[in-house]
Amino acid sequence: MRNTIKSTNSLAGYFLVSTLQMPDSRFAGQVVYVCSHNSNGALGLVINKPDCNLSFAQVLREMGMEVSRAELPSVYIGGPVSLDAAFVLYRSHPYEGNHIDITDNISLSREKELLELVVGENSSRNYLFLVGYVGWESGQLELELRDNSWLVVPGDEQVIFDLPDGEKWKAAAAYYGIDITTFNENLGYA
């Protein structure tokens, strides 16, 4: 039986690109992919922050899985909340287990069986493995948006899966032709 939830919430599938006005230094230069957003709050994953101290092979071994591939992808810090929670953000394919279809092309799961499929693939360009997430209570994200902490742009699977991590922040903002390194949304009025 396929348990699929189609996410249709307002900012699900969008990027939150941190601006220079971001007051929380943990998110400076970060791109968050919003997976769920509704009246109860929001959940997102930082897509450009690999953890150099944690190897994917180590995580798999701790889960009791065999590791046969020599080259495995990075583990990303998806956010500061629940660093013991693991997620797979992936280009959609006919996975039958529990997952959320965020868009027609991008899905999210926490299932161990999906990890086994992912490890068997030849390309790590179809998924990100993340620990932790970014969470907002009801109304909290909206306040951050009003404070110009985030630039909201449509999510793009090429930015998530194909670009080097160091290019994702600028590339996501460039969707609107913005140079995020000089972007200042605080306007003066005469």
UniProtKB/Swiss-Prot annotation:
Pfam families, A to Z: DUF179
InterPro entries: AlgH-like
GO cellular component, one term: cytosol
HAMAP family, A to Z: UPF0301 (MF_00758)
Family: Belongs to the UPF0301 (AlgH) family.
Protein name: UPF0301 protein DP2218
Organism for this UniProt entry: Desulfotalea psychrophila (strain LSv54 / DSM 12343)
